[in-house]
Amino acid sequence: MFLAYEAIKMWKKTALYVLAGLLMGLAVCIRVTSIFILLAIMVWILVSRNWKKLLQWGVPTLTGMILFSILWQGIYQYHVDFDTSESAITVEHFVMMGSTGDGMYNWDDVLFTKSFATHEERAENNRRVWLQRVRENGLLGNLKLIIKKEEIVWGIGASGYSQYVENVVEQTPCYDWMVGEKSGLFRAYMQAYNIVLFALILLGTVTMISKKKSNPYMWIIGIYWCGALVFYIFWEAHPRYSVSIVPLLTMLIVPCLEICLFDMNHGQ
């Protein structure tokens, strides 16, 4: 999308936007939260009232996503020649799971959802339990849960990495230092890095907001982050969920660095 935005020739812009749509379609299949960046771009265009950009960018990108959807459905139906909708976990299940305890994955909720035979029954009962939990939590309880979930998603520097290396074949000294009994130093380093990183991201965000004119890319990423924050108010929480988002958020540090470099160059 960046290449398409910077391209001068119209045919090249259109081709790159279609390609971006194809790639975005694939990304959404892998992880649905990938669509947040598209929504952020749309919000920025609507807020800036640049309707020409919306048509110039939106139509070819949407075309690319539709093309990918058609191709994907054909490939999926060829390789999976049976209906998977009845056995699939519902969207409501993950919202329900995020409404109790610390808002993280729990096996009891999985067993509850699987106890119903049809997709409609699962969705209906997931919604019923979610509403019941929201009422039982009360205003203060829901607020505390939201804060806890955001802390889990954004505040844990280790990003839940240890659960992916628990079943190694051989526990070497490197394993001990990174995951095992001697991993305290490594975990402390990751947490310290995460604190510094988000402090800089927040500082850069404040700098961007305070500037009269900011790069549109920065605003798009800021809106993207706001969307993710809202999403995890409702969704089940896990430290790994921030891993695919943080690389983009690091770009929000740029406005702060620009001011620092400007001050250094002018001897301030």
Predicted feature residues:
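Membrane-proximal stem/loop segments at transmembrane-domain junctions that anchor or position
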Residues: 77-171
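Membrane-interface alpha helices of multi-pass inner-membrane proteins
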Residues: 16-31, 41-42, 60, 64-68, ...
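Membrane-interface catalytic loops of GT-C/OST-like multi-pass glycosylation enzymes that act
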Residues: 30-32, 219, 232-246
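Membrane-interface transmembrane helices that cradle and orient dolichyl/undecaprenyl
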Residues: 1-16, 260, 264-266
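Transmembrane-embedded, aromatic-rich helix segments that form part
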Residues: 33-48, 58
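Membrane-interface anchor segments at the N-terminal boundary of transmembrane helices
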Residues: 145-221, 225
